[in-house]
Amino acid sequence: MLKRWILTLFVVCLGFSQVAKAELELVITEGIDSARPIGIVPFKWHGEGKLPQDISAIISSDLQRSGKFSPVATNKMPQTPYKDSDINYEAWTKMGVDAIVTGEVKLNAQGKYEVTYKLIDVVRGQLTKGQSKALDESGKLVLTRDHILVNKVASLSTKQLRKYAHRISDVVYEKLTGERGAFLTRIAYVVVNDKAQYPYQLRIADYDGYNERLVLKSKQPIMSPAWSPDGKKLAYVSFENRKSQIFIMNIYTGKRELIASYPRHNGAPRFSHDGDKLAIVLSKSGSLQIYVVDLKTKKMSQITRGRANNTEPFWAPDNKSLIFTSDRGGKPQIYRVNLGDGSTKRLTWQGSQNLGGQITPDGKYIVMVNRSETGFNLAKQDLETGAVQVLTKTLLDESPSIAPNGGMVIYSSIYRKQNVLSMVSIDGRFKARLPATNGRVRAPAWSPFL
């Protein structure tokens, strides 16, 4: 039963398109009215024509996708100041906005873009009129202007503008939430285009679909990409030699290393969080079983045994246990195995099937594919209480992958009879999809912090 399900999952675990500025166009499908309002004021451009990148629009989109912020539309802003001295604090606080981002861009003498931005605490600014004071080390009363939370300047090339906009988003997100932002991360995914010379393509892009790059192309299936913790390598399954094999590839040099090429099935690679080991699934002894390969010594240890099929391993944050999918109870459910003593515990009970589990970076939740009367949808389970929350309402969801800060999940779903990538915030309130312009997109993997 599980073996048939795994084969079906592998056969469709493919998809993608051609090189372009953004092959994946992110479309918001469900926003958040109750998210925290924030003002991302259009950056003032001191130059001719248009900026190559709309920095404020990128920041606004990033923060909205996090599910925690609701940027005020430009046409609804009470004003569009680019200097903190021009801010009408009362006008912003009346809208419920407690923070705004302002900035300006100009060309410097070296021909680069000089970007200046500030993150401003509107409430603090209203209380102090922007003129807060405090005693310095010598006991002298000085102007602190502590309503300005961030004040930075950078000199950038045209190619660096978009990346720096994501950097600003990371800074703003962390300053206001206390959590690290994940807007400078990437996603890897597989695309299949039946009409292409090489139908199967492994690609990477910025988390929002921009700056897409081809990593590998093949006439045979590619599936199950997984990032190394340093973001430099991808493990994946290839059928290029007419059988399943597991490789690790350096995405910058293209150098590959063959990890597993045993009889029958080789699949589901997953790096440990320290990068020293790789969990894989083999069927060389009959049923699907989980093994761990030491990447330095190449020594391999078998983790699961028995007649049941065990697959989809994922490491706990402390690397001391794995969660995995098993049909030992009749239908696929998620279990945890202690790597020290081999003890195993079933974790999921709600829903006829639960599979594809991943643990959030803080170790508090499992995100998984949950089958219920409504179909296959993503769900989140609290590991302490066992409470389950269904996160999505899309069709035939699979392959969830969690952002390194735990704030968002990317996954594969069906939209208009086509495989697309979709996103959902970890609380289920914000949803978006990234339909490709050409090809079927599957098997997403969110990178670590880069």
Swiss-Prot record:
Coiled-coil residues: none
According to the UniProt entry, where is the signal peptide? Answer: 1-22
Say which domain of life the source belongs to.
Bacteria
Q: Which Gene3D superfamilies match?
A: TolB, C-terminal domain, TolB, N-terminal domain
InterPro entries reported in the protein's UniProt record:
6-blade_b-propeller_TolB-like (IPR011042), PD40 (IPR011659), Tol-Pal_TolB (IPR014167), TolB_N (IPR007195)
Q: What is its main location?
A: periplasm
User: What keywords is this UniProt entry annotated with?
Assistant: Cell cycle, Cell division, Periplasm, Signal
GO cellular component terms, A-Z: periplasmic space
| Gene Ontology biological process terms from the UniProt entry | cell division; protein import
Subcellular localization, as worded in the UniProt entry = Periplasm
**Cited function:** Part of the Tol-Pal system, which plays a role in outer membrane invagination during cell division and is important for maintaining outer membrane integrity.
Question: What PANTHER family does the database record attribute to this sequence?
Answer: PROTEIN TOLB, PROTEIN TOLB HOMOLOG
Subunit and interaction comment = The Tol-Pal system is composed of five core proteins: the inner membrane proteins TolA, TolQ and TolR, the periplasmic protein TolB and the outer membrane protein Pal. They form a network linking the inner and outer membranes and the peptidoglycan layer.
| Family affiliation | Belongs to the TolB family.
The protein depicted here goes by the name Tol-Pal system protein TolB
Native source organism of the sequence: Aliivibrio fischeri (strain ATCC 700601 / ES114) (Vibrio fischeri)
Q: Which gene encodes it?
A: tolB
